[in-house]
C-alpha cells in the first residue's frame, strides 16, 4: 500500500499566505499538511490494514516517471516479501506493508512515532530544484472538486519559500542543521536509515537503495 503525504495537503483555498511574500505557502510544515487527518489515517492503517473509506488520492494526476530497478533486485525482494507474507498467512494473519511517501515525514512527532521504519533519502539542493522544475506543477485538492486543480510555482518560489521550508523541516535531523551533507544528529543515528541519492558525494545506485530499504522493512516483519 502506498500512502502519499501530498494527498493530505489542505484544500487549496485553505493554504496560508507566506507572511513576507504574500503567496500561498504549500511547503511550510505547519500549514502544508492536514496533520490530524494524517495521524488518524495512519492509525486506521495500523488497526485495520487500510486507509479510511473517505480517503481520496489525486497522485495519479501528477506526472509519473519510471525509476528503473535492476530486475534481479526486484525478483529477489518480491520473493522474500512473498515468503514472509505466506508465513504470516499460515498463522492466520494477512500482513499489509504500508509505504508512506512524502517531503515532511519527520516533522510531526506523532507521525514519526507511527512509523515502524524510517528512511530518509538525502538529495542536494541543486537536484531537488531541478526535479521540482521538471514536474511543471502539482495537482492539489480543492473543496469543490476532488480531482483538484494544478498548482504551478510562481517566480522565485523555490528560493524564497520551498527550499527554506525544506531546511526548517529537516535541520533537526542533522548535526549543525546541515541538511546537504551533514551527519545524522546523535538522536537519529539509530532511528533513521539514511540513503544517499543522486548528486551526493557517495551516490548509491537504485539497486543498493532498494536493498537497504527492503532489508530494513523485513527486519521488523518477522512472523
Q: What is the role of each PLM region?
A:
Residues 1-3, 12, 16, 21-22, ...:
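Preference for well-ordered, secondary-structure-rich cores of eukaryotic proteins
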Residues 2-4, 118-120, 191-195:
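Conserved beta-strand scaffold positions in the cores of enzyme catalytic domains, especially
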Residues 52-94, 142-148, 178-191:
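Intrinsically disordered, low-complexity domain-flanking/linker segments in eukaryotic proteins
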Residues 73-144:
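ATP-dependent NMP and nucleoside kinases share a basic, alpha-helical "lid"
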Residues 41-49, 134-141, 173:
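Conserved AAA+ ATPase "sensor/coupling" helix adjacent to the nucleotide-binding pocket
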Residues 93-95, 134-138, 160-223:
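NTP-dependent small-molecule kinase module
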Residues 10-76:
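Conserved nucleotide-sensing/catalytic segment adjacent to the nucleotide-binding pocket
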Residues 107-109, 114, 142-151, 156, ...:
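C-terminal regulatory/interaction module of P-loop NTP-utilizing enzymes
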Amino acid at each position: 500500500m502506498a500512502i502519499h503525504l501530498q494527498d493530505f495537503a489542505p484544500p487549496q483555498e485553505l493554504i496560508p499566505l507566506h507572511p513576507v511574500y504574500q503567496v500561498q505557502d504549500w511547503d511550510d510544515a505547519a500549514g502544508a499538511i492536514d496533520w490530524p487527518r494524517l495521524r488518524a489515517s495512519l492509525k486506521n492503517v495500523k488497526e485495520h490494514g487500510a486507509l479510511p473509506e473517505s480517503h481520496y488520492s489525486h497522485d495519479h494526476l501528477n506526472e509519473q516517471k519510471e525509476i528503473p530497478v535492476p530486475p534481479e533486485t526486484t525478483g529477489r525482494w518480491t520473493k522474500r516479501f512473498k515468503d514472509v507474507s505466506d508465513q504470516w498467512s499460515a498463522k492466520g494473519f494477512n500482513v499489509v506493508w504500508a509505504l508512506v511517501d512524502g517531503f515532511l515525514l519527520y516533522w510531526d512527532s506523532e507521525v514519526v512515532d507511527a512509523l515502524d521504519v524510517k528512511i530518509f533519502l538525502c538529495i542536494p539542493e541543486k537536484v531537488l530544484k531541478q526535479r521540482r522544475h521538471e514536474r511543471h506543477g502539482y495537482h492539489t485538492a480543492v473543496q469543490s472538486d476532488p480531482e483538484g486543480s494544478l498548482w504551478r510555482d510562481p517566480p522565485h518560489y523555490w528560493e524564497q519559500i520551498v527550499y527554506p521550508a525544506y531546511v526548517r523541516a529537516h535541520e533537526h535531523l542533522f548535526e549543525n542543521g546541515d541538511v546537504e551533507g551533514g551527519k545524522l544528529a546523535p538522536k537519529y543515528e539509530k532511528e533513521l536509515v539514511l540513503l544517499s541519492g543522486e548528486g551526493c558525494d557517495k551516490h548509491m545506485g537504485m539497486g543498493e537503495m532498494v536493498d537497504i530499504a527492503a532489508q530494513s522493512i523485513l527486519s521488523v516483519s518477522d512472523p
